[in-house]
Design a protein with these regions (language model features):
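His/Asp/Glu-enriched, well-ordered alpha-helical/loop segment
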Residues: 163-173, 191-203, 209-293
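Active-site gating loops and adjacent loop-to-helix segments of metal-dependent hydrolytic enzymes
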Residues: 11-22, 65-93, 135-147, 151, ...
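Divalent metal-dependent hydrolysis catalytic cores, especially in the metallo-beta-lactamase
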Residues: 7-36, 52-65, 92-104, 120-122, ...
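Active-site core of metal-dependent hydrolases
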Residues: 86, 90-212
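Short, electropositive alpha-helical surface patch
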Residues: 33-48, 111-120, 258-265
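Charged helix-capping and loop-helix junction motifs
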Residues: 3-5, 36-40, 81-83, 156-162
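Active-site mouth loops of central-metabolism enzymes
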Residues: 1-4, 25, 71-78, 120-124
């Protein structure tokens, strides 16, 4: 991504009230990931005034199940590779704060045991059964990427990943709350089984977020289109979200999630997931003075960064 594209993205997020962000990478060759991470580091180091601050990266791929790859490019999937991961992590100055892995892949357990001392390890794009999921969490994974999506559904005789995560109090679960990736009833259900302290709202938005309907864009080396507010690949697969995190939070409240739980899931909990809670995520003495002043119905907001209104 070019420098002006990175800054345009950060400017858009700040405008809508997302004052910090942690973008996700895609399943790509290491040499491409290396360049993308270097670009992200430049933006994080620059931190231009008035732009949303890049606090970390979620490495979403390439250690994924082919069956549950979703919109990830299958040509670049590979088994967990700690040496390769560490080369990328060191190359970007430790900016990777979450690394995703499908625990049923060969070498996944050892990868998790090693990577947990480097950053948060998340179970993602997986066809794992209940036992493999429990193994992953016992080995040190403490996060579940976009709950419900790119993983087996809950079944009473084959519970799978979701119950394994829910019954482990150390595991947080992400949820894309755009009204498309999960039904409102399943949003309420997620908050009821994980609790407000363990839910992390995410936008999962691609570069199409904020773009006009009909826009064509690139996603992990694949063409995608924004049609009627939905981002899709050429074969119709949902590519990503086109909703920002503020709107995801408002959606959660409108879907029936307690206001305090939705706000926490869009602020403090994600800050904890990327080890940024000492800086952001809540209004406390010594933290960065980033906050929003919202109308009662959340239709309007005033955005403050470092104590200054944008």
């Amino acid at each position: 991504m070019l420098a002006h594209h990175r800054k345009a993205m950060a400017a858009y997020y700040a405008k809508v009230g997302v004052t910090s962000f942690a973008p996700a990478s895609m399943t790509l060759p290491y040499e491409v990931l290396e360049k993308a991470l270097a670009n992200a580091r430049k933006l994080a180091d620059e931190s231009p005034a008035g732009l949303s601050v890049l606090r970390g990266i979620q490495m979403e791929g390439p250690y994924f199940s082919y069956k549950k790859r979703g919109a990830q490019n299958p040509d670049y999937l590979k088994a967990p590779d700690f040496e390769g991961f560490m080369a990328l992590q060191e190359g970007c100055g430790g900016l990777i704060r979450i690394v995703d892995v499908a625990p049923e892949l060969p070498g996944a357990e050892e990868f998790i045991r090693q990577a947990k001392d480097v950053c948060t390890v998340s179970v993602a794009h997986t066809d794992a059964d209940y036992d493999h999921a429990r193994m992953a969490f016992a080995a040190g994974a403490t996060h579940l990427t976009h709950l419900y999506n790119a993983m087996p559904a809950i079944h009473h005789r084959n519970p799978g990943v979701i119950p394994a995560a829910a019954e482990n109090p150390s595991v947080r679960a992400e949820l894309i709350c755009d009204g498309l990736h999960a039904h409102p009833a399943m949003v309420r259900f997620a908050f009821s089984i994980f609790g407000g302290a363990r839910m992390v709202l995410v936008s999962d938005s691609g570069r199409c977020c904020g773009m006009p309907n009909g826009s064509k864009f690139e996603l992990g080396g694949q063409d995608a289109w924004l049609v009627d507010g939905v981002a899709r690949l050429a074969d119709g697969t949902i590519a990503c979200s086109a909703t920002n995190l503020y709107d995801c939070m408002v959606n959660a409240i409108r879907f029936g999630v307690a206001e305090e739980d939705a706000v926490r899931a869009a602020s403090f909990n994600p800050a904890c997931a990327i080890s940024a809670e000492s800086l952001v995520g809540s209004i406390e003495t010594g933290k960065v003075a980033d906050f929003l002043v919202c109308s009662a119905d959340y239709a309007d907001r005033r955005v403050f960064m470092a104590g200054q209104e944008l």
